[in-house]
C-alpha cells in the first residue's frame, strides 16, 4: 500500500509516525521535524501547514496498516540508496528523542523501521 508519489512526502509521513506513535506529538518533536523539513522541502512556504496535513493523513490510516505502508513504500522507492534510508532512520531517532524520553511504543517503531530498511537492503543484494 503506497500512499506517496514523492520520497520526501513519504519521509514526512515517517516523521509523523515517529512523533505520534506514543499517542501525541510533543512540541520539541514538532520543532525537530520542522527543522528537518527545511532540508527535504527547501523553499516550502508553509512547513507547519504541510506538517499538519501529513499528520492528518497519518491519523486517517488504520494503525494496523502503518507498517504495511512503510514496507511497501520502501520497496516502491527502491532507487533510494541504503545510505539515504539509513540517514532517515537516524533522523527518526532524533524525532523520538526530542521530548527527552523514548517510550516503549517509540522504541518498537524505531526497531520496526530499522528492520524494514535492513530487510530491503538484503532483498536488493540478493537480486543483484
Stretches with model-predicted labels:
Residues 1-128:
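Small-residue-enriched hydrophobic alpha-helices in membranes
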